[in-house]
Amino acid sequence: MQIPKTLLAELQQADPRRLYTSTSNRFWIVDAPEKTGEKDGPPETDDFLVERAIHIDGKIQGMRGQAFFDREPNTTDDFCAILARTNKPLLTHEIGQWNVFPNLAEIPKYKGVLRPINLEAIRDDLKKNGLLSQAPDFTRASGKFAAELYKQEIELALRSHPLAGYQLLDLHDYPGQGTAHVGFLDSFWDSKGVADPAAFREVAGPVVPLVRMPKRVYTSNETFAAKVEFANFSQQPLAAVSTKWELRSPEGLIAEGNLPAVDIPLGACHPAGEIQIPLSGVTKPTVATLTLTAGAAKNSWRIWIVPPAATIDAKGVFVTPSLREAKAALTKGGRVLYTPAKAAIRQRQDTAFLPCFWSPVYFTNQAGTMGLLIDNKHPALADFPTADHTDWQWWSILTPSPGAVVLDQVALKSKPIVQVIDAFSRNQKLGLVFEAKVGAGHLVICAADFSEAALQDPMRRQLRSSLVRYLSKSKTPPSDELTSAQLDQLFQGVSDNEKTIHGEWAKDLEPPPPKK
């Protein structure tokens, strides 16, 4: 590091008006010099640091989403403790970089000497696999999810004091390094239609209202509580700022109010009051939006509210993780919710809640999936509040998940109710929730853990309840059909001791007692 140190010293002497740093993304060790030696720390010549992680107490401490989004979704996380250990201003390095499924409508824009053979290869592969018509939906759904992740990343930075700033790698795609389509704009700087500029400015503007809430999913017997604060990076402090708040669902206004006026100095983490809302008036599963407005500044967040106990009218519905029991019920014309364990899925693909980072081709040590494409108008999801793309209420269902079912070999004509968007380097048809007629029976398959322990989670309970209610009331058989042999192609029995979760035919399906 002697050359950069010498160069910086010369530049600082030649032009002291500017601030200089020798590197970015260096993973500096910031322990006390007596522990590590001064040579391990950033050069004294550096005026500031640009890092995505630093070494503290022998551990790498991350400062962007990958280090935080593997835990229950919340808006309380920050990296203040990391910043407290540094003695120089620090900016986070290239936050975001969430991959969006390539926009194939970009192909005709290449009219010069460069040919987009990567996009052409993806297009041809999708066509071969019968998925080409879904490509625009893959781009839109993965892009909407990426936009939400960018919002969460920026807010994570704004909640961290005294952070000097954050860097986004870019807002447009990088066509190289394995096709790194990580932007809201394509390689030609044209919008993909996945991010609303006004909504993005709410979180990337000069004054940003923020909330700290411990989770995103609530039950209706709880009280929603959040702390309000501001990040003010405008030109001046703000005096007597009054904040209006409201919590609203598609069914109407849940609650509203105003916080006492406060002064907002420059910088981040300035408290502005607290909100408490009893949720007992919410009588059905819903998604609600909390909105804060303070003058021209505005910001909003979604939360999900579900009943504390999902009552299931399971009359005529059999719920089981056992392939043997599912097939036996189907032969009797039963309505079955089959929830296979990871080991039971023969044709499976690892999944993750988060989309792949940068590119599934460049970084191959990740699941590579790119979020969900959801038929949120399907009656199977009538009691499970969801948009048509991944959002925070899916985190607990996908973390962990048995994986997605690869449907390429059974050629179902219908799209899955909940489809996992595969990496563009594979382009498999992946089902998380899908249905088929099996003989005279109606089968819904959900690759999620509905064990007793897992059902402590409100969203898992609600998803199971919604699927069971759909099966109990459905009067139209699925258009697709699977044979018993095709089920064996996709799944396998994994234990003689598999137990049903609920099924009125459970006793009929128990093996006969051994002969004496």
What are these regions (language model features)?
Residues M1-L185:
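Substrate-binding/catalytic cleft of secreted carbohydrate-active enzymes
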Residues A14, L169-S234, S495:
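Aromatic-rich peripheral "rim/lid" segments of glycoside hydrolase catalytic domains that contact
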Residues R26-W28, G96-N99, H172-Y174, E229, ...:
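Short, solvent-exposed loop/turn segments at secondary-structure junctions
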Residues Q66-D77, K342-R346, W358-P458, K475-K516:
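Catalytic beta-strand/loop cores that center a nucleophilic Ser/Cys/Thr
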Residues E222-V262, A272-P278, K284-A294:
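Beta-strand-rich binding/interaction modules
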Residues G295-S300:
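Short, exposed coil/turn segments at beta-strand boundaries within extracellular/luminal domains
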Residues W304-S322, P478, L482:
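Low-complexity, Pro/Ser/Thr- and charge-rich linker/hinge segments at domain boundaries
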Residues K315-P360, A440-H442, L467:
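Short alpha-beta junction capping motif
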